[in-house]
A protein has these predicted regions:
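Short helix-initiation/N-cap motifs at beta->coil->alpha
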Residues: 58-59, 73-84, 165-179, 211-213
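Short loop->beta-strand "edge-of-pocket" segments that line small-molecule binding or catalytic clefts
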Residues: 30-36, 54, 133-148
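Alpha-to-beta junction loops
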Residues: 32-33, 69-71, 87-96, 140-142, ...
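Extracytoplasmic small-molecule ligand-binding "clamshell" domains
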Residues: 20-97, 105
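Ligand-binding clefts/hinges and TM-proximal coupling segments of bilobed small-molecule sensing domains
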Residues: 21, 150-165, 204-206, 235-255
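A ligand-binding cleft/hinge motif common to bilobed small-molecule-binding domains
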Residues: 81, 97-105, 153-157, 175-211
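Flexible hinge/capping segments at coil-to-helix
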Residues: 23, 124-141
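Periplasmic-binding protein-like
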Residues: 38, 115-119, 189, 193-235, ...
């Protein structure tokens, strides 16, 4: 009962702060529109058989909608256009994305709730050849990236000598490695740990993680009322143990 009263208090407080906020519209429409790619295991995955979403971020968004007292609607998005979806008002919020200066130019970010490192993936049979980050930085090496991801930008920084090959979703960079069309790719340590289990022919380069990065939800830039509400909600959920429970559920460990 106390939780319900507290949630109502938060909603009324922030909604009254700015009647033109996304928060006010979400409450008025009774629906939270969430942009998500559905291709990032275990954060957001779309089951092609049922067209339903599941994952860490999906559970987070369902909980947010529940506390707001509204329905949740997942809007399909692609990495190359996920930022544009926020600016074009196709959705009210996104599932987690990496906070980058480029994205922050046009979109707002909530407080962060997950931190990860970046690692390279190669074929296990090539692990002796590509045992370090530096071994992949070679003019004879092809590094695959997925168009629009933060890893696409990181690859340019980490591998200036290598050939970079961008693929467009629904294709994924690691699939190029599996098919032998690329020597490696980089991804979050979170996804990499899942991929090497799902595809035992892949291996993580054992040279350590680089570039610690933070995940957050994207919201419309300049909408402080909506951003403040969601950020306050995230912090409250951290304190309540909600995120800790989800980390255990999905066998994750934030840095």
């Amino acid at each position: 009962m106390l939780r319900v009263i507290y949630t109502i208090f938060l909603v009324l407080f922030f909604a009254n702060a700015n009647a033109n906020s996304t928060l006010d519209r979400v409450l008025k429409d009774g629906e939270l529109r969430v942009g998500t790619t559905g291709d990032w295991d275990p954060m957001s995955m779309k089951d092609p058989a049922t067209n339903k979403y599941k994952g860490f971020d999906i559970d987070v968004m369902r909980e947010l909608a529940k506390d707001l007292g509204v329905k949740v609607k997942f809007v399909p998005a692609e990495w190359k256009t996920i930022v544009a979806g926020i600016t074009a008002d196709r959705y009210d919020i996104s599932t987690s994305v990496t906070k980058t200066p480029k994205r922050a130019e046009v979109a707002g970010f909530t407080t962060t709730y997950y931190k990860y490192g970046t690692v390279p993936l190669v074929l296990k049979k090539n692990l002796k050849k590509f045992a370090t980050w530096n071994s992949l930085n070679n003019k004879d090496v092809t590094i695959a990236t997925t168009l629009g991801t933060s890893q696409e930008e990181k690859a340019k920084e980490f591998f200036p000598k290598s050939r970079l090959k961008s693929v467009e979703a629904p294709a994924r960079d690691f699939q190029e490695v599996l098919a032998g069309r690329a020597d490696g790719n980089i991804t979050s340590s979170t996804e990499a740990n899942k991929l090497v289990i799902k595809y035992p022919q892949l291996a993580i380069v054992p040279d350590g993680e680089k570039n610690p990065a933070f995940l957050a939800m994207m919201v419309p830039k300049g909408d402080k009322t909506w951003n403040n509400y969601v950020s306050k909600w995230i912090n409250d959920k951290k304190n309540s143990g909600f995120f800790k429970t989800l980390l255990t559920k999905y066998n994750l460990k934030s840095l």
